Amino acid sequence: MLKKSRVLGKIPIPYLIKGSSCFYSTVVTSAPITLEDSLQSILSDIQDGSNIVTPNKPNTNLLTSKQPIKALKHLQWKTNLRVKKTTRLLKYSNEKLTPEDYSVFVNQLMDVYSKDIELLNKTEVWKSLYHIYRVFVVNAVDDGNAMVLYDLNQFVRMFINLNDLPLARNVFQLILKNSKNGEIPKDVQTICMYLRLYCGALSELWTTQTSRNFYQDLIGSLSGSNASSIRIPSHIAYPTIGVPQFQLLLRKLVEDPEYSKLRNTEMDSLIIQALGHYKEVPFLKQYISIFYGIDENVTITETHPGIKKLTPDSQLLKSVISAYGHNNNITSGMTVIGSFMEKYPEMNLDKSFWRTTIYWSLREWNKYKDSKGSQPKKAWNLMLNWYATIGKAVPFDQKIMLYRLSFLKSRKDHNAAIRDVQQVFKRIFIKTEKNTFIVERLVLYAYQRFIIKNLVNQNENAKCVDFINEWRIDFENGRYLERYFKELTHPKNESDEQKKLNDEDDDYNFPLFGTNIL
């Protein structure tokens, strides 16, 4: 079914991939935080744990009472979450607590985390909860227990979210240790976690000098209030398995019926990311063609007979554009994305997908070879056309608009900026005496200042006045824009050095509800 490539060469097929201590990574960490500090930080934010979840019926014990924060406070008060003391407390409790009770408790805490990340965003706390789980639950149940497999995968996901890759891998090694012959269990989530941990399918960890340069340039062009929403990704060491081991896994997933029947869009998106990481572009193209009937020559075909048909989603298309972008082929990537949109018009593409697409189009844009910015323009128009096709207005997204503004500023294209204001901001702001869209307002002010400054620099003062009259969102905004226009057209006497400083930062020095934000 699949042609040979460097990935699918002629290779032996022993056991899938066994646990090994060689899967190790180091991570750059901040100053150590004690468990007690972490717990106190959490608990100080909570006055009453019952405000988080209200039980619907009487409960049998504290761990399953649907008040996980209250239970966490109790354990911290009794044992400070020390593994031996907590395990002993649970084991000999008068409530006769079971491993299942602790599993419920941990999953309730994870649910709290998913709803309010800042509340439980403490690695030390989760590390203690995991080690308690390992002793109180894993050691007490049989190998291959479905509950344990699910929970351990949840711990892996948690430590990935907390940027603790070594600990996530340690948890996964426990999964392999408890599985038959040390093989990866035939379980979708476990396979997906393996792809993330060991096969490069965490594109957010693809930090290169190119990506760091991109973020530094972006922050430089968006200095001020809006720059706070942009962060240079911290570097995390991310060693992955070699090509031969990846070959082995891929053949299992594609050709072994026991594994191929598990395919879903999440697994496909991770496989595509992994292929991008390993720079297997020929096989990447082949994979998309066989399983989705798409290729970069704008050819749309039926998927291969007998292959499980899946409808792509935002996550899968994010992986496609990231894989192509990572291999310096963003133009082909956007062509493939366009073919996906044509073949699968029922897809629901969310803002995170468009954010990723705009990001890669800018990151791979060479302003010296492509002075017109054809790649960023194509990505932007692709988004506009998509929303027009489905009959929806373009939704506001802070990062997308800041990416876009940095591009327009580099080209001094105020006409495109005016169109953006009409297409994106018009539906958000209603002219009132006091508009309260804070984040949107910050970005709109940046657009307004850029447009006004550019028009003044081109002696288009009449157009500038028209723009101010049309796009003032309230009295305060209008008064500020008029004052800014007067400053530009009637400059005060100042030194050349001071003028330079003002030019660098005045795009983001504006009032918000009477306050100067810097």
From Swiss-Prot:
Annotated protein name in UniProt: ATPase expression protein 2, mitochondrial
Keyword Secreted part of the UniProt annotation: no
Pfam families, A to Z: ATP13
Localization per Swiss-Prot or TrEMBL: Mitochondrion
Organism: Kluyveromyces lactis (strain ATCC 8585 / CBS 2359 / DSM 70799 / NBRC 1267 / NRRL Y-1140 / WM37)
Gene Ontology cellular-component annotations: mitochondrion
Keyword annotations: Mitochondrion, RNA-binding, Transit peptide, Translation regulation
General function of this protein: Required for translation of the mitochondrial OLI1 transcript coding for the mitochondrial ATP synthase subunit 9.
InterPro entries reported in the protein's UniProt record: ATPase_expression_mit
Subunit structure: Binds to the 5'UTR of the OLI1 mRNA.
Gene: AEP2
GO MF annotations, alphabetized: RNA binding
Transit peptide interval: 1-15
Family: Belongs to the AEP2 family.
GO biological process annotation, one example: regulation of translation
